[in-house]
Design a protein with these regions (language model features):
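Conserved S-adenosyl-L-methionine
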Residues: 40, 46-101
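Short, surface-exposed loop/helix-turn segments at secondary-structure junctions
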Residues: 218-226
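Conserved Class I SAM-dependent methyltransferase catalytic core
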Residues: 232-277
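Class I S-adenosyl-L-methionine
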Residues: 269-305
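SAM-dependent nucleic-acid methyltransferase catalytic core
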Residues: 2-23, 28-33, 39-46, 89-206, ...
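Short, polar loop motifs at secondary-structure junctions
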Residues: 54-59, 165-167, 255-258
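Short His-Asn-centered micro-motif
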Residues: 53, 72, 181-184, 206-208, ...
Length: 305
C-alpha cells in the first residue's frame, strides 16, 4: 500500500491526569488508540481549539486538554445526551438508577426501547439512550431507515450504571469551553471559519464511520444513514481544502483498507498504520486486532517515522 509510514514519535501532549473512561460504549471508540493519536494531534500549546465533526463516544475529548472544543455529530440523540449530562449529571444518574433497577431483562428492555422510540427529545429520552447503550447487544448504536433504534437485548449478566464516568465527563466540560452541535460534517467544518471559532487557532480530528474490510465485516450506519465511499471522498476533499486554505492541522482515523489508502492518500494525507483491538463488534466471538490508519495534514511536518 502506498504512502504508509510506520513508527512512533514522542507524544506532543503532557497528561496531567489519566483520561476518564467514556460513559457510553461506542463502536470504533478511540480509548485504545489514544496514545497513538496524541503522537499526531497538535498540542494545546500549538492550537486553542479541537474540532470533532464525529464526536462519537468522546474518548478524544476526555483524553486531551485543549482550552476549547467544538464537538458535533449527525446523531441528534447522542448530542442531546451530552448536553443533558453536562447540564445536570446528578439528575441523569437518578433517572438511570430508576431505569436500571428492574431493567436487565428482555421484557423491560423492549418496553424501554419502545419508549425511547416514542418520546420526544428531553432528559428522559437521553437517560433511555444510556440505558439502551448499556443493555443492548454489544453496545451497538443502530437505527433503521425510519430512525427507529432497533438493536436487540444483549443478555448481560449485570449492567453497569456509569456514574463515575458521567460525573467525570461533566467535570471536564467545566474545565474548558465546550460547544455541542447536532450537525453534518460539512456544516461543522464551516463553523471553524465563522462566528465564535473564526478567531481561534483550531485543529480538526475526524473519526468517521469506517469502511469495512469486507462485505460482512460490519456496518457504517449509526444515525439511520450509511456513510459511503463517496462520503469519505467528500470528507477527504473538504479537509484537504480547509488545510490548504487556512493551514489548519487535520488528523483522521480510518480503517486500514486499500480504498482508505486511496481516498486519503490522494488527498495528501500522510498515513501511519497501527493495530488496535476492536471492543465492539457484531459478533462478540470475533473481536480481534485490526489494522487502523491515522492520517495527518500538518504544515512543516517532516517524516517522523
Amino acid at each position: 500500500m502506498n504512502n504508509l509510514l510506520t513508527g512512533n514519535v514522542p507524544a506532543r501532549h503532557t497528561r496531567r491526569r489519566l483520561p476518564s473512561r467514556p460513559f457510553l460504549k461506542w463502536a470504533g471508540g478511540k480509548r485504545r488508540s489514544l496514545a497513538t493519536l496524541l503522537q499526531r494531534l497538535p498540542s494545546p500549546d500549538e492550537v486553542e481549539c479541537l474540532v470533532e465533526p464525529f464526536v462519537g463516544g468522546a474518548s478524544v475529548f476526555l483524553g486531551t486538554d485543549y482550552r476549547q472544543y467544538l464537538l458535533a455529530d449527525i446523531n441528534a440523540d447522542l448530542i442531546d445526551v451530552y448536553l443533558h449530562v453536562r447540564d445536570d449529571p446528578a439528575g441523569m444518574i437518578k433517572r438511570l438508577e430508576r431505569l436500571f433497577l428492574q431493567g436487565n431483562n428482555e421484557t423491560a428492555y423492549r418496553e424501554n426501547r419502545d419508549e425511547f422510540n416514542r418520546i420526544q427529545a428531553g432528559p428522559e429520552k437521553s437517560a433511555l439512550f444510556i440505558y439502551l447503550n448499556q443493555h443492548c447487544f454489544n453496545g451497538i448504536c443502530r437505527y433503521n431507515k425510519q430512525g427507529i433504534f432497533n438493536v436487540p437485548f444483549g443478555r448481560r449478566k449485570a449492567a453497569y450504571i456509569p456514574e463515575t464516568e458521567i460525573m467525570a465527563f461533566a467535570r471536564k466540560t467545566e474545565r474548558c469551553h465546550v460547544s455541542f452541535f447536532h450537525a453534518e460534517f460539512e456544516d461543522t467544518l464551516k463553523m471553524t471559519t465563522a462566528g465564535m471559532f473564526a478567531g481561534l487557532s483550531c485543529a480538526v480530528y475526524c473519526d468517521p464511520p469506517y469502511l469495512p474490510v469486507s462485505q460482512t465485516a460490519g456496518f457504517t450506519a449509526y444515525s439511520g444513514d450509511v456513510f459511503t465511499v463517496s462520503d469519505h471522498e467528500r470528507l477527504a476533499g473538504q479537509l484537504a481544502a480547509l488545510h490548504a486554505r487556512k493551514g489548519m492541522p487535520v488528523v483522521i482515523s480510518a480503517s486500514d483498507t486499500l480504498i482508505s489508502h486511496r481516498i486519503y492518500g490522494e488527498a495528501g494525507f500522510r498515513l501511519y498504520g497501527h493495530d488496535v483491538v476492536r471492543s465492539v463488534s457484531a459478533s462478540a466471538a470475533s473481536r480481534k486486532t485490526a489494522g487502523e490508519l491515522t492520517g495527518v495534514l500538518m504544515r512543516g511536518q517532516g517524516d517522523k517515522s
